[in-house]
Amino acid sequence: MKGLGDSRPRHLSDSLDPPHEPLFAGPDRNPYLLSPTEAFAREARFPGQNTLPGDGLFPLNNQLPPPSSTFPRIHYNSHFEVPEESPFPSHAQATKINRLPANLLDQFEKQLPIHRDGFSTLQFPRGEAKARGESPGRIRHLVHSVQRLFFTKAPSMEGTTGKVGGNGGKKGVLEDGKGRRAKSKERAKAGEPKRRSRSNISGWWSSDDNLDGEGGAFRSGPASGLMTLGRQPERTQPRYFMHAYNTISGHMLKTTKNTTTELTAPPPPPAPPATCPSLGVGTDTNYVKRGSWSTLTLSHAHEVCQKTSATLDKSLLKSKSCHQGLAYHYLQVPGGGGEWSTTLLSPRDMDSTAEGPIPCRRMRSGSYIKAMGDEDSDESGGGSPKPSPKTAARRQSYLRATQQSLGEQSNPRRSLDRLDSVDMPLPSKYPSWEEDYNPISDSLNDSGCISQVFGQASLIPQLFGHDQQVREADLSDQYEAACESACSEAESTAAEALDLSLPSYFRSRSHSYLRAIQAGCSQEEDSVSLQSLSPPPSTGSLSNSRTLPSSSCLVAYKKTPPPVPPRTTSKPFISVTVQSSTESAQDTYLDSQDHKSEVTSQSGLSNSSDSLDSSTRPPSVTRGGITPGPEAPEPPPKHAALKSEHGTLTSSESHSEAVPKRKLSSIGIQVDCIQPVPKEEPSPATKFQSIGVQVEDDWRSSAPSHSMSSRRDTDSDTQDANDSSCKSSERSLPDCTSHPNSISIDAGPRQAPKIAQIKRNLSYGDNSDPALEASSLPPPDPWMETSSSSPAEPAQPGACRRDGYWFLKLLQAETERLEGWCCQMDKETKENNLSEEVLGKVLSAVGSAQLLMSQKFQQFRGICEQNLNPDANPRPTAQDLAGFWDLLQLSIEDISMKFDELYHLKANSWQLVETPEKRKEEKKPPPPVPKKPAKSKAAVSRDKASDAGDKQRQEARKRLLAAKRAASVRQNSATESADSIEIYVPEAQTRL
């Protein structure tokens, strides 16, 4: 139960986001450091108004000293403050408490003096240095269990809480959300032992501490105070909220699960103040205790959820004035507790609300951290399993939706809530809160703002990176549970408001790419919303989700791509890849679908749905490619956004402003769904060839370049033909006019170059380094160019048959290549003061090349001309030409090796590097001079030596010729199939 209690404190942190109203009526009431023995006399601040007495009613045994965990649940009056700290009473307590009807809890709450210190500082004596194994995930489980199972499985929930915190925060959350049961139990069981023992600076458990322990991101106890709804900064002041925020979240949610209807009914949403008494957000109180947060109704839960996300963003910013100085950053929502309290639906909602901020944190600790390898994830990783990508996606989408629609619509902001628990549309107040929230989130965009709001930069990463992910994800799940049980109708309303099918967006996650390609992303606006929701893979990802906590999660999530691997620069455009299109992108997609899919997409945010859109709209690829190109640098900002959330948010915002630049990173397909503007830059699309997905537009516009690239691939065999291979391949198109297909036109030239190049490679074995050849060598395949000049070539079918023209082309290419090498070496000798040895090598290579060109090349040229002359007698056949060419290849290979060595020397600043072989040879003693034998013996030995040398040379030549013939056969077959290959590649890319 203590573990649960700690989890509860996490709820406190969950409720970190304050309601719009000042969470605390005023710091007039100092945080009550209720000793565990001290009855949790509710402060007057939290009078019976807390309609959700569950929080306050349920003693947070964890918060209470060890005895407090044992004190009867009925001691709610006395223990309410501490219970706030304890998210969940001890199993027995929690179970009993949860079993208490909402009315009973309300009565208890009323009976108890409510400390209206608010959540300012839920500092509970840490008499028990409890291992706070509860992580956001674990608390999430507790909340879910409380919401759905705690009333029935309070003990198991508590046990589960520990587990959740330690192990399956994410799983537990998801499972708790779906079957808040066994895992909750397991977590409660493991939670106690796993609970992190947090040494709070004050020595008291603060709501932040609870959050920290459970949120992981909020582990820093005092710093955790940041999550404290109470504005009061006295971190050292232990504050007990008479209605344990977490208790209500957990216990009330548990009871709420049972009595959610009861709680909701007894404290009807219309009387949010009554429902909010626990909130302390009641109209009478500006400070909302965590308990009150948990008490927040579903509407408040939505608000809180989003606001809690915003709490980091808006609430923190709004409470920034309060927070900056606060030891415990009391998140104060300018909107006023009234809105929140008025929107209160049920303790469960309150719990969800309490978790509102935590979903983001949970998300951050969860999928986001997973993807990002967030430091926060490390903090809370052990304590709380990270929320599943879905949860993270939900939270992200929620954040994005909230960001997008905070100003525009409250529901979109609730997208996360909707995604998590599509149970209620936020009240109109919530939108106003969202509006406030947006500025806050904007302010929070800067990590400085965040640190200001939270007072600890270190906390911020934790909050945003991990706890928010985990907690927000958990809260999302918990919120789902609470909303489901408490606000099914609100859920339907929210679903309607969402206009999203949660399943669909989940499906879109898994099938976003297919959807984009197949459906063409008819939901451009959805994809746009995804883009906006999940800002462009670059920093923009946060732009729409101004809610820094959640948006930073999103950004981090996408940035996580860096950890996950942000895609390449082009991939950043591929929001899906970066964005975990399966998760946040789709959540975002659904969310933004509702309200801001278009707006968000305009915001330049690219989501998986965005990429889906781009995928579906291959023509947009050019735009997408173009757009991503400009934004390709942004992906680093995206990571930067992870680093500096404000920066990311800023980028996102700027992206949102530049809708046309929206990065459409369809999965592997760069397509700009919504932005025709990116079409302006079709050239970048070609850049995406590396992606392997080329949109038809790009292919059509850059088909030659594609074929060129293919050619280059083939030519890459002969790296020396880099530049000229393109030219020659283009020229070879005419040369190989025989290739009927325009595509194969490129292919044809490639085929010829391929053959020649392949032969060349085989013969010279890549005589020169690709880099050297590309930069310093003459056009690699001039022969290909000559092929264009040979009109007879077109007659040849696709294979560019090897006749005189073919070999003349090869000869011309080789001649130009060798001449280029010679010229290059001449320049080098003139420009550089080469050593005699190097100069000798240069002269040797150049002389050999010139000799080869002047003699053998000329001879071969004559043979080729004879072959082309039908009247020639004898007329050499193609086989004769091929055989002679193979012989030439031996010489060309030797010369190529020499030039290759020269280029290596050049790369080495013309410094001779003795190879081990040479050294060995030098070291090897000269062969012993045979003693002068008889002349006859000497003659015999000479004959034998000459014979042996001749045999070796002949064998080597035979091997070379055999290898060359085999290579020639391979080249021929490749050339013959070049057309189909060439056609196939473009088709495949076009299909993509």
From Swiss-Prot:
Residues 1-31, 154-226, 342-435, 527-665, 677-751, 763-798, 915-992 are annotated as: Disordered. The gene is Dlgap4. Keywords: Membrane, Methylation, Phosphoprotein. GO terms for biological process: modification of postsynaptic structure; modulation of chemical synaptic transmission; regulation of synapse maturation; signaling. The lineage of its organism: Eukaryota, Metazoa, Chordata, Craniata, Vertebrata. One of its GO terms (cellular component) is dendrite. It comes from Rattus norvegicus (Rat). Its main location: membrane. Residues 199-208, 399-413, 576-591, 969-978 have a biased composition (Polar residues). This is Disks large-associated protein 4. The modification Phosphoserine is found at residues 206-207, 377, 380, 384, 388, 405, 415, 421, 580-581, 609, 611, 665, 744, 973. PANTHER family: DISKS LARGE-ASSOCIATED PROTEIN 4, DISKS LARGE-ASSOCIATED PROTEIN DAP SAP90/PSD-95-ASSOCIATED PROTEIN.
